């Protein structure tokens, strides 16, 4: 295939949409582990019943069914909110439709979460706000039975087939017991590169404030082991597919060149997914037939020796103050939502550190789970 056609297709997909005049919105996705407090596997039949009750109560509509006929995704047609299960029925996700105000998202999320908790508690189940399911050893860590997740599971389990000078962890099923959150923002063309540069620069600060993925009793030195799961699996064979940008983007040409250097490992054809070893995009279409990161260091409980902790938290405070001013300028009173982060900065902690401190002080794991299940 002609190289210029490939470049143009990538431009149309990733750059051109930012040129359309539109209002600015925010979207949020939050994944949470489901736990059986009896320390037994989560019964997926119970999860399917709760999904049905949720859909009836909030008038959500079916969006996706697995190969066994069970609903794994449902959507609200008014706001665009989605209830789904990510990778496994052990991992629930609430994706909030776009809004201008954070409080509107917070209100709907709280309503959904409270309903789900009430239903789960009938079976001695709970959601909790931990990034790694602390009861993963009791669960059936199997993928949702559909083409997409079966393809992903196969890809992650193929790490044993590679003889590469990189470290592969031995948790290919990590998607079934680890959770994440995402934020989506509308960005205009003129702000695209400055925004990507800015977000790259705050990644280490995010690690300091938000780390929340402790693999209890195994890798407790890591406060955000989910990054290790993501980067040291088959997704990370090409480092441009994971982590931060390895270069400082200066232009849209730099961004496109970076996108061109990423790899694909599957394709969908006639409704079916086909796996392949990771291959760079440009190389794929040319077939005859179709430096270290500071963020990684801040994922550890122990800061590197060259980091001055006082200066680090002074930087964290300055970044939070910039965020506070930005929210004040929006005029919705949303700056109050930053107070927990100012508290973390003041106490030099984050959810992962707090979890480990509670454990070391003798707090029982179930008590920690319930503490992390509370809406703040």
What are these regions (language model features)?
Residues 116, 120-138:
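Carboxylate/His-rich catalytic cores and anion/metal-binding grooves
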């Amino acid at each position: 295939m002609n190289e210029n056609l490939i470049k143009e297709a990538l431009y149309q997909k990733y750059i051109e949409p930012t040129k359309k005049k539109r209002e600015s919105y925010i979207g949020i996705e939050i994944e949470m582990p489901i736990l059986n407090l009896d320390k037994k596997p989560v019964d997926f039949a119970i999860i399917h019943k709760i999904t049905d009750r949720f859909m009836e109560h909030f008038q959500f509509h079916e969006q996706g069914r697995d190969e066994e006929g069970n609903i794994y995704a449902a959507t609200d047609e008014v706001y665009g909110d989605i209830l789904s299960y990510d990778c496994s029925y052990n991992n629930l996700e609430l994706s909030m439709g776009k809004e201008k105000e954070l409080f509107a998202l917070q209100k709907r999320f709280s309503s959904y979460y409270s309903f789900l908790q009430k239903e789960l508690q009938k079976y001695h189940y709970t959601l909790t706000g931990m990034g790694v399911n602390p009861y993963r050893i009791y669960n059936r860590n199997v993928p949702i039975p559909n083409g997409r997740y079966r393809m992903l599971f196969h890809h992650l389990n193929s790490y044993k087939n590679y003889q590469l000078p990189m470290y592969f962890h031995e948790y290919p099923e990590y998607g079934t017991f680890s959770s994440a959150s995402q934020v989506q923002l509308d960005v205009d063309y003129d702000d695209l590169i400055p925004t990507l540069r800015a977000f790259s620069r705050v990644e280490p600060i995010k690690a300091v404030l938000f780390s929340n993925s402790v693999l209890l009793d195994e890798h407790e030195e890591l406060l955000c082991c989910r990054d290790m799961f993501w980067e040291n699996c088959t997704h990370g064979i090409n480092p441009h597919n994971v982590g931060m940008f390895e270069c400082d983007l200066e232009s849209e040409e730099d961004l496109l060149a970076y996108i061109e250097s990423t790899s694909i490992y599957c394709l969908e054809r006639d409704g079916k997914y086909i796996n392949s070893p990771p291959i760079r995009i440009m190389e794929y279409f040319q077939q005859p037939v179709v430096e270290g990161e500071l963020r990684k260091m801040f994922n550890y409980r122990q800061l590197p020796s060259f980091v001055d902790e006082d200066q680090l938290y002074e930087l964290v405070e300055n970044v939070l103050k910039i965020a506070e001013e930005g929210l004040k300028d929006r005029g919705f009173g949303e700056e109050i939502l930053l107070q927990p982060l100012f508290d973390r900065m003041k106490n030099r902690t984050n959810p992962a550190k707090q979890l480990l401190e509670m454990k070391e002080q003798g707090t029982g794991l179930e008590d920690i789970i319930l503490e992390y299940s509370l809406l703040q």
